[in-house]
């Protein structure tokens, strides 16, 4: 089973951008992390992967290159690898997630909250990975999923990173390069 990843881009979700940027954190005390419900990510989300491929994000990569340590092409390759997925859309309502694949196939399941995992990055920062498990393990929907939206408490995100596996949470490998 391969791990699938996806990120949505700002402006591609159903709801208006409405969170407080002060809640976005990459350094925090572990005890500050709060449990969250799937409803925090409610809405219709679109993968950023096609935009990394088709040139839509090229201006962003160029701007990053002006400030960063890589060229625009290196950033583009880096993000293409991190965003890579065959899922085009994710729809979240209540405890239910429906995944739409490139071929149009749709699969979904209700999910139960398992808890959070604190991911320590090599950069010295960290993230709260909110974990959910499919209730219907035979639906074809990913069984184990983790959300990261750079927040540690309930809030409506402007985007999120999601990692998935049908094997286990431990099978979600290479967190530095697979978002």
Question: What does each model-found stretch correspond to?
Answer:
Residues 28-44:
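N-terminal helix-cap/turn-to-beta initiation motif at the start of protein domains
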Residues 46-53, 96, 102:
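Generic short beta-strand segments
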Residues 33, 51-52, 85, 101:
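Positively charged, hydrophobic/aromatic-enriched amphipathic segments
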Residues 42, 49-56, 83:
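Sec/Tat-exported extracytoplasmic proteins
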Residues 35-37, 48-54, 71-72, 178-179:
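General structural signal for secondary-structure boundaries
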Residues 5, 10, 14-31, 92-179:
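Calycin-type beta-barrel ligand-binding domains and close structural analogs
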């Amino acid at each position: 089973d391969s791990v699938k990843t996806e990120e949505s881009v700002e402006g591609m979700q159903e709801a208006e951008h409405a969170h407080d940027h002060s809640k976005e954190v990459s350094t925090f005390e572990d005890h500050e992390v709060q449990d969250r419900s799937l409803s925090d990510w409610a809405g219709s989300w679109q993968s950023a992967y096609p935009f990394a491929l088709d040139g839509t994000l090229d201006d962003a990569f160029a701007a990053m290159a002006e400030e960063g340590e890589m060229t625009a092409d290196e950033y583009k390759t880096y993000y293409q690898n991190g965003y890579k997925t065959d899922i085009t859309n994710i729809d979240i309502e209540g405890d239910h997630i429906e995944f739409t694949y490139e071929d149009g196939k749709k699969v979904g399941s209700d999910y139960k909250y398992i808890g959070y995992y604190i991911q320590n990055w090599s950069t010295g920062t960290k993230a709260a990975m909110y974990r959910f498990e499919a209730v219907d393990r035979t639906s074809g929907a990913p069984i184990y999923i983790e959300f990261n939206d750079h927040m540690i408490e309930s809030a409506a995100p402007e985007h999120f990173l999601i990692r998935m596996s049908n094997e286990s949470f431990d099978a979600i490998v290479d967190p530095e390069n697979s978002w």
